[in-house]
Swiss-Prot record:
It comes from Macrococcus caseolyticus (strain JCSC5402). This is Ribosomal RNA small subunit methyltransferase G. Its EC number is 2.1.1.-. S-adenosyl-L-methionine binds at residues 77, 82, 128-129, 146. It is found in: Cytoplasm. Keywords: Cytoplasm, Methyltransferase, rRNA processing, S-adenosyl-L-methionine, Transferase.
Length: 238
């Protein structure tokens, strides 16, 4: 997906990028490739692939969820900033917090946000399990995560951070439907309920994606998230 097709596909979905936003995505790509030579941020570096598999893919939740109605987003394990930085470019009013366990990635994100002239961005070096126990617990309108872990694990890392009435939006791959079935037990225990599971195919390569919208119906029990590593080793399964 070249830049023109990127803009065209977004326009078809009702998003017309300003010159400034287009420039931000161009700088994002250049900065990503430059830093990727020093630290491992992504295996995808070809320009057309980055625009499709990182930038466009990160924006897909906005086809189904109105981010104009929310203010704060927490992105768990965003790596090189996906999906929250592309969403921030699209919706400049958003206040985003990214939690990542690798300090090198946090350094990259700090540099990137300065290059893109982004404001109201916070980058936290922490494990999601620890972060979800502290002052930010149940404080975000939306929590996002993309391809970090299976949904049964991811729910324990993300739902504790969502305020009651807020949303956990997970970007999942081809196994999205199976993961939802497997994750229903964990989602319920953690205070969530599945609102929608939107299937879509990425343009050009036609690969399957699912955008999962989980609403936080009740507070998460205090025992969750469990200590670092436990959700992955012992997922909440029926």
């Amino acid at each position: 997906m070249n830049e023109m097709k990127f803009l065209q596909h977004l326009k078809e979905k009702g998003f017309e990028l300003t010159d400034e936003q287009q420039k931000q995505f161009a700088i994002y790509y250049e900065t990503l490739v430059e830093w990727n030579e020093k630290i491992n941020l992504t295996a995808v570096t070809e320009k057309e692939e980055v625009y499709l598999k990182h930038f466009f893919d990160s924006i897909t939740p906005s086809f189904y969820f109105d981010f104009n109605k929310v203010k704060s987003i927490c992105d768990v394990g965003a790596g090189a900033g996906f999906p929250s930085i592309p969403l921030k470019i699209l919706y400049p009013h958003l206040e985003i917090t990214i939690v990542d366990s690798l300090n090198k990635r946090i350094n990259f994100l700090n540099h990137l946000s300065a290059e893109l002239n982004l404001t109201n961005c916070h980058f936290v070096h922490d494990r999601a399990e620890t972060f979800g126990k502290g002052e930010y617990r149940e404080s975000f309108d939306v929590v996002t995560a993309r391809a970090v872990a299976r949904l049964s694990v991811l729910s324990e890392l993300c739902l504790p951070l969502v305020k009651k009435g807020g949303h956990f939006i997970a970007l999942k791959g081809a196994q999205g439907e199976i993961e939802v079935e497997e994750g229903l037990f964990a989602i319920s225990i953690l205070g969530g309920a599945v609102v929608e599971n939107h299937p879509l195919t990425l343009p050009e390569e036609e690969s399957m994606r699912y955008i999962l919208d989980i609403e936080k119906k009740r507070q998460t029990p205090k025992k969750y998230p469990r200590k670092p590593g436990t959700p992955n080793k012992e997922p909440l399964l029926k």
